[in-house]
Curated annotation (Swiss-Prot):
Segments on the Cytoplasmic side according to the record's topology features: 1-32
Organism: Rickettsia bellii (strain RML369-C)
InterPro entries given in the database record: Cell_div_FtsQ/DivIB_C, FtsQ, POTRA, POTRA_FtsQ_type
Protein name: Cell division protein FtsQ
Gene field: ftsQ
Coiled coil: none
Function: Essential cell division protein.
Superkingdom, natural source: Bacteria
Cellular component per GO, a single term: cell division site
Matches recorded under Pfam families: FtsQ_DivIB_C, POTRA_1
């Protein structure tokens, strides 16, 4: 009799455990469904209210722009300063606003960013001058040389930045050639500008091994500059030119790479 009683107790305990587990699973399922319903309701509410507020915001903006325009805050004038190589129609196209439209409807940051997409423009300042003027101050890139690389020609600024492929308006600029020539052109141009007579007779500068320059002068003279302190070599060439001992000596090549000994080759 004792054995049967013990067995019955075990069976009863198992049944109770199974019932408890089912209840727990049922509660978890119900809670999960409830949470999902709440999340869904929140998303529906957010979507509905967002659309409502967006619509309200748009309505208010339209009315504010209309009211301020009637009060005289409308676009009548555009003042542009610093403009040299960027034409006015290009700037006004970026402005994308009709005369008489609300001056507050213009997004100044957007105008500024769009203008900076023009490769000529390094920096730009845009502001409203109430009640009716937009002021644009341009800081354009200044071309210092024409860079030839991979059979292509580019106008470059002092940073080596490729401004434009339209080189025709700048035939007077120094022609620099080779890999890295755009990066190092600024220093060479600045030094050559100290000797106007010399730079005017320099047809091109070739970057050699990304470490030094060869100058090709008019008249077929090639000058090999040293990798370091080429300023002294330029002084020497300018002195020869001033003494009239450069272009009438039948020179083919002047090798100035060794500051202690110059080599001269004639035709």
């Amino acid at each position: 009799m004792r054995k049967k009683t013990s067995s019955n107790k075990k069976n009863t305990a198992k049944k109770n455990n199974n019932i408890s587990l089912h209840r727990k699973l049922g509660l978890i399922y119900k809670k999960t469904i409830l949470i999902l319903k709440i999340v869904l309701i929140i998303f529906i509410c957010l979507f509905a209210f967002t659309k409502y507020f967006a619509s309200l915001k748009s309505y208010l903006k339209t009315n504010i722009y209309q009211t301020t325009t009637e009060l005289g805050f409308k676009l009548e004038n555009v003042i542009i300063e610093g403009q040299q190589n960027v034409d006015e129609p290009t700037i006004l196209k970026v402005l994308n606003a009709k005369k008489g439209s609300s001056i507050f409807a213009l997004n100044l940051d957007e105008i500024r960013n769009n203008l900076k997409n023009n490769r000529w423009i390094k920096e730009v300042y845009v502001s409203r001058r109430l009640p009716s003027t937009i002021y644009i101050k341009l800081f354009e890139r200044e071309p210092i040389a024409i860079w030839q690389i991979n059979n292509q020609l580019f106008l470059i600024d002092e940073e080596g930045y490729e401004i434009s492929k339209n080189i025709e308006p700048f035939p007077h600029l120094l022609h620099v050639v080779g890999e890295g020539a755009n990066i190092y052109a600024s220093k060479l141009v600045n030094e050559l500008q100290k000797y106007p007579a010399l730079i005017n007779k320099t047809s091109s500068a070739i970057r050699c091994g990304d470490r030094r320059w060869d100058l090709n002068l008019k008249g077929g003279i090639n000058i090999k500059l040293p990798a370091k302190n080429f300023e002294e070599a330029l002084k020497y060439i300018d002195a020869l030119n001033k003494a009239n001992k450069l272009f009438n000596q039948n020179y083919k090549q002047l090798d100035l790479r060794d500051k202690n000994k110059y080599y001269i080759e004639k035709y």
